[in-house]
Amino acid sequence: MKPIREFKSDEEFQKIAKDLQHKLFLDDWFIIFGLTDEPIRISGGYSSGLTTFDYGNREATILILNKDNWDYSADVAEYKPTVIKNCALLNLLHELLHLKREYIVPSDILGDGADELSEMEKKDVHTNLEKMAKTLFMMITGTNTDYFLK
């Protein structure tokens, strides 16, 4: 598969998203995939991807920023300048891995315990998801870490 910084069409995005859903063994999830040209507003700033889900019903929505030249460091004051370039395919993999992680320790099962995780533990989980997404990205596209640099 060729690396994709920005999807050319919604049709291309939907096809690839469904293919990756299948390859990650997430076929039992009902997922609505969407693209946006605007950074996604989250608490405390903006993001290039967002997943909302209900583990019990296995349903989710995944929204991906489809903008090649977005530099989140310019949009979010609390972020330092970044050397990583936005990549829609990487963002899609990252968001799908949020659902995959739910098979390991579902948030619904953690219940209130999820709130007891320290901010550092939450960041560590998210950092590891990003590392896994980058690893998968490089494996399926045949790229190396240089691809992510601006």
What spans do the regions from the language model cover?
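Active-site scaffold of zinc-dependent metalloenzymes
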Residues: 43-86, 103
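Post-HEXXH active-site segment of zinc metalloproteases
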Residues: 83-86, 102-142
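Active-site recognition of the HExxH zinc-binding catalytic motif
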Residues: 90-103
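Propeptide-to-catalytic entry region of secreted or membrane-anchored zinc metalloproteases
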Residues: 1-3, 28-42
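A short, highly charged nucleic-acid-interacting micro-segment common to nuclease
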Residues: 2-13, 122, 126
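Zn2+-dependent metallopeptidase catalytic core
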Residues: 8-29
